[in-house]
């Protein structure tokens, strides 16, 4: 569980509602404070700072776990602690109010303070030292015991089993606990009920994680099968210490001894934590949008993670959160791994903390990485995690605001999550005093989260300033090309720029952005011309002009609209081809012209079908429709500004299939939301054709379901091609653009035609292009 402190570095703004279908909560203002942003993504001190945070992560000290480790008796004497240094730490680190724990002053973390304080009191009583500290600790417990049964308080994992057991242990030690006997009895009854429920319904894995709450010898025997190869229970010092106290297990001792050698005076709540913490920090950097500053270190971290994955590391595979995050990061970045490794999490009962919303969310996100048509493990994980998260969201039980907003966003946009939108939302909700809560609270010690947040905000805003200038230039280009004179046409320069800026936002990708937007704008106007403004004769005239590219003056223009459209295409392609030559070292104009020609002919064919009232077969429609969807001219030209693409790559089956799957997604998504409007205009699409050829057997609802199935098929195939590296010759940066197109299309066509709507996407676009983020120190 992630928690937000009440004392924070806050992001302030004037909030606007925006949607795509229900996206909410963007901010505007400007950054306060200065952090030097490198001129290039590969320069400056920022890289060194983040590298240090990524490679040398330390967790905060855990009073709770240190107290349990301090309770372990010496091997040769039950009257002496095995680790006296831990006992000394407990005696030296009581807070002024009598409690132990992180100095958070969080009003909803009192249960955590109660748990840590009682563990420390038990330790002191166990060794009959620090009686004054004991009395102060008991006073704190007595003053705050109300929180133990307050459902609004954040509850440490297993609190209802562990805390009553510690109370029972204290009573047996002779402690005069300032508690009402009836309250103690009620907590003990609740503990026993939860223990029985855990045994009967969920197995015993979650019992092993909260082993210090067990009281029966049979329970201890049951949980021993969850002991890890390093001797611990789920890398938990407290659980392992409790197990050793009860069973004197040699492997438990070895683990505890390794802790003592690694940590001087006190222990964290998780150990080892190298993989988990590095994965967590890398995930944070990606969400903040600044991971590009440490690309080489990121690659090394992922290589290390992959090696641990292939070795079957306990630190990964016995922790569902770590497993899910590692799976998502590795598969996203092209590592060949099987989803079968997540099979143990196909049912919620197998989680050792089944109520951990953060864990369930990570499993849900991992389930979205299905790249094969038959990945039943991911399908089953998706089924239960999506249901569980929707239920918790509906009931309003996710108390942490940042986590609640992330769950809401991810559920509503499973396939439409765009990088820059997620960066902004994460920056907005990011809290520099966040702590995580498992059996006790903890945080990363050497991660300067204030610095990261300030840097991420300024990085976002600097890129945004660049976007604003580019968009101004593009809007002037629309006027200069006279495209704005065609009043029947949709003017979508801002939406087009928003789409590409959500992924290719870095300064280096200027030409790719310009190419994407110019082709998108022209294509939208041409599409409207074919549907609204032009006769078949005019359409044929435009195609002939493109066919006679260098000799177009011999053709002539059937209308002023044709002249405007042709010269927009002609001048833009010539200009882009000249720029691309400098990147590619060869002329790519013929490919760009042919791409446009193929698109224009496919749209003309559809116009002829409408005019002649032709009913095609489904195969005829699809084989033409994925081309008329129009992604070809937009994507192909942009890719020439990302990487050097040989003719072998451009003509490869891989390249063609990436385009085909992307275009199929485009066509089918559009058809699904426009079935009724297309029918009213006499146009056929993949929904109506199924009904027509179904001879009364297939309903429109069934046809929509089949189209949805087809979309998912092509989405998985596309994602597989994007992430797989073996046998691939298309550069990863280029494959990512195909995937971007898929996600932006899912966003635009989530529930209706958001691209054509003049207002539906405007606030989302403004959030990326026009509204900077403001950070204020409070």
Swiss-Prot record:
<dbReference type="Pfam" id="PF03936">
    <property type="entry name" value="Terpene_synth_C"/>
</dbReference>
<dbReference type="GO" id="GO:0000287">
    <property type="term" value="F:magnesium ion binding"/>
</dbReference>
<dbReference type="InterPro" id="IPR005630">
    <property type="entry name" value="Terpene_synthase_metal-bd"/>
</dbReference>
<feature type="binding site">
    <location>
        <position position="527"/>
    </location>
    <ligand>
        <name>Mg(2+) 2</name>
    </ligand>
</feature>
<dbReference type="InterPro" id="IPR008949">
    <property type="entry name" value="Isoprenoid_synthase_dom_sf"/>
</dbReference>
<keyword id="KW-0479">Metal-binding</keyword>
<feature type="binding site">
    <location>
        <position position="671"/>
    </location>
    <ligand>
        <name>Mg(2+) 3</name>
    </ligand>
</feature>
<feature type="binding site">
    <location>
        <position position="670"/>
    </location>
    <ligand>
        <name>Mg(2+) 3</name>
    </ligand>
</feature>
<feature type="binding site">
    <location>
        <position position="531"/>
    </location>
    <ligand>
        <name>Mg(2+) 1</name>
    </ligand>
</feature>
<protein>
    <recommendedName>
        <fullName>Ent-sandaracopimaradiene synthase KSL3, chloroplastic</fullName>
        <ecNumber>4.2.3.29</ecNumber>
        <ecNumber>4.2.3.-</ecNumber>
    </recommendedName>
</protein>
<keyword id="KW-0809">Transit peptide</keyword>
<dbReference type="Pfam" id="PF01397">
    <property type="entry name" value="Terpene_synth"/>
</dbReference>
<comment type="function">
    <text>Diterpene cyclase involved in the biosynthesis of labdane-related diterpenoids (LRDs) natural products. Catalyzes the cyclization of ent-CDP into ent-sandaracopimaradiene as a major, and ent-pimaradiene and ent-labdatriene as minor products.</text>
</comment>
<dbReference type="InterPro" id="IPR050148">
    <property type="entry name" value="Terpene_synthase-like"/>
</dbReference>
<comment type="pathway">
    <text>Secondary metabolite biosynthesis; terpenoid biosynthesis.</text>
</comment>
<comment type="similarity">
    <text>Belongs to the terpene synthase family.</text>
</comment>
<feature type="binding site">
    <location>
        <position position="527"/>
    </location>
    <ligand>
        <name>Mg(2+) 1</name>
    </ligand>
</feature>
<feature type="binding site">
    <location>
        <position position="678"/>
    </location>
    <ligand>
        <name>Mg(2+) 3</name>
    </ligand>
</feature>
<keyword id="KW-0934">Plastid</keyword>
<dbReference type="GO" id="GO:0009899">
    <property type="term" value="F:ent-kaurene synthase activity"/>
</dbReference>
<keyword id="KW-0456">Lyase</keyword>
<dbReference type="InterPro" id="IPR008930">
    <property type="entry name" value="Terpenoid_cyclase/PrenylTrfase"/>
</dbReference>
<dbReference type="GO" id="GO:0034280">
    <property type="term" value="F:ent-sandaracopimaradiene synthase activity"/>
</dbReference>
<feature type="binding site">
    <location>
        <position position="531"/>
    </location>
    <ligand>
        <name>Mg(2+) 2</name>
    </ligand>
</feature>
<dbReference type="GO" id="GO:0009686">
    <property type="term" value="P:gibberellin biosynthetic process"/>
</dbReference>
<dbReference type="InterPro" id="IPR001906">
    <property type="entry name" value="Terpene_synth_N"/>
</dbReference>
<feature type="short sequence motif" description="DDXXD motif">
    <location>
        <begin position="527"/>
        <end position="531"/>
    </location>
</feature>
<dbReference type="GO" id="GO:0009507">
    <property type="term" value="C:chloroplast"/>
</dbReference>
<feature type="transit peptide" description="Chloroplast">
    <location>
        <begin position="1"/>
        <end position="35"/>
    </location>
</feature>
<keyword id="KW-0460">Magnesium</keyword>
<dbReference type="GO" id="GO:0010333">
    <property type="term" value="F:terpene synthase activity"/>
</dbReference>
<dbReference type="InterPro" id="IPR036965">
    <property type="entry name" value="Terpene_synth_N_sf"/>
</dbReference>
<keyword id="KW-0150">Chloroplast</keyword>
């Amino acid at each position: 569980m992630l928690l937000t402190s009440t004392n924070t570095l806050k992001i302030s703004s004037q909030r606007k509602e925006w949607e795509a279908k229900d996206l909410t909560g963007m901010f505007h203002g400007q950054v306060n404070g200065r952090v030097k942003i490198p001129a290039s993504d590969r320069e400056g001190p920022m890289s060194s700072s983040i590298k240090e945070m990524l490679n040398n992560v330390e967790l905060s000290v855990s009073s709770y776990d240190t107290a349990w480790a301090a309770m372990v008796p010496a091997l040769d004497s039950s009257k002496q602690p095995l680790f006296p240094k831990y006992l000394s730490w407990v005696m030296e680190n009581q807070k002024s109010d009598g409690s132990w724990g992180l100095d958070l002053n969080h009003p909803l973390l009192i249960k955590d303070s109660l748990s840590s304080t009682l563990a420390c009191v038990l330790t002191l009583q166990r060794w009959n030292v620090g009686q004054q500290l004991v009395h102060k600790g008991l006073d704190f417990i007595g003053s705050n015991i109300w929180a133990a049964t307050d459902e609004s308080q954040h509850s440490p994992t297993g609190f209802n089993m562990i805390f009553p057991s510690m109370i029972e242990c204290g009573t047996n030690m002779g402690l005069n606990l300032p508690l009402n006997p009836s309250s103690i009895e009620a907590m003990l009854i609740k503990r026993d009920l939860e223990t029985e429920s855990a045994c009967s319904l969920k197995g015993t894995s979650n019992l092993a994680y909260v082993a210090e709450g067990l009281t029966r010898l049979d329970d201890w025997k049951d949980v021993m099968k969850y002991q890890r190869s390093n001797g611990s229970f789920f890398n938990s010092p407290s659980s392992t210490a409790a197990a050793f106290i009860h069973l004197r297990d040699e492997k438990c001792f070895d683990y505890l001894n390794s802790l003592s050698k690694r940590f001087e005076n006190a222990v964290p709540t998780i150990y080892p934590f190298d993989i988990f913490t590095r994965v967590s920090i890398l995930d944070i950097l990606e969400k903040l949008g600044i991971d590009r500053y440490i690309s080489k270190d990121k690659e090394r971290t992922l290589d290390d993670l992959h090696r641990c994955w292939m070795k079957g590391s306990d630190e990964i595979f016995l922790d569902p959160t770590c497993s899910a995050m590692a799976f998502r990061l590795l598969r996203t970045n092209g590592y060949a791994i099987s989803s079968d490794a997540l099979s143990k999490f196909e049912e919620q009962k197998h989680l050792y903390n089944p109520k951990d919303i953060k864990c369930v969310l990570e499993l849900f996100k991992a389930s979205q990485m299905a790249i094969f048509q038959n990945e039943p493990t991911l399908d089953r994980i998706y089924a239960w995690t999506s249901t569980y998260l929707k239920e918790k969201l509906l009931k309003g039980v996710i108390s942490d605001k940042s986590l609640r907003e992330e769950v809401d966003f991810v559920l509503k946009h499973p396939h439409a999550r765009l990088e820059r939108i997620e960066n902004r939302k994460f920056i907005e909700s990011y809290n520099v005093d966040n702590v995580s809560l498992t059996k006790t609270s903890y945080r990363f010690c050497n991660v300067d989260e204030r610095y990261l947040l300030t840097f991420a905000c300024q990085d976002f805003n600097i890129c945004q300033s660049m976007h604003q200038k580019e968009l101004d230039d593009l809007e002037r280009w629309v006027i200069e090309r006279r495209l704005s004179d065609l009043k029947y046409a949709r003017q979508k320069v801002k939406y087009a720029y928003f789409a590409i800026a959500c992924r290719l936002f870095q300064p280096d990708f200027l030409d790719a952005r310009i190419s994407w937007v110019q082709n998108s704008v022209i294509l939208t106007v041409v599409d409207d011309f074919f549907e609204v403004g032009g006769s078949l004769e005019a359409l044929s005239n435009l195609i002939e002009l493109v066919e006679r590219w260098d000799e177009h003056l011999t053709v002539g223009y059937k209308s002023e609209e044709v002249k405007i459209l042709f010269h927009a295409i002609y001048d833009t392609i010539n200009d882009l081809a000249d720029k691309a030559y400098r990147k590619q070292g060869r002329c790519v104009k013929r490919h760009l012209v042919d791409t446009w020609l193929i698109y224009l002919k496919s749209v003309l064919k559809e116009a002829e079908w409408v005019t002649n009232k032709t009913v095609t077969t489904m195969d005829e429609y699809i084989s033409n429709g994925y081309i008329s969807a129009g992604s070809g001219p937009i994507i192909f030209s942009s890719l020439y500004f990302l990487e050097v693409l040989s003719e072998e790559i451009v003509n490869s089956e891989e390249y063609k299939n990436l385009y085909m799957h992307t275009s199929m997604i485009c066509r089918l998504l559009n058809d699904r939301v426009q079935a009724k409007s297309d029918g009213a205009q006499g146009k056929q699409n993949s929904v109506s054709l199924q009904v027509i050829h179904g001879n009364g057997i297939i309903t429109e609802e069934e046809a929509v379901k089949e189209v949805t199935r087809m979309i998912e098929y092509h989405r998985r195939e596309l994602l597989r091609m994007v992430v797989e590296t073996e046998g691939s010759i298309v550069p990863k940066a280029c494959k990512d653009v195909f995937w971007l197109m898929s996600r932006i299309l899912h966003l635009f066509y989530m529930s209706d035609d958001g691209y054509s709507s003049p207002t539906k996407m405007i606030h989302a676009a403004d959030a990326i292009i026009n509204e900077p983020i403001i950070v204020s120190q409070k």
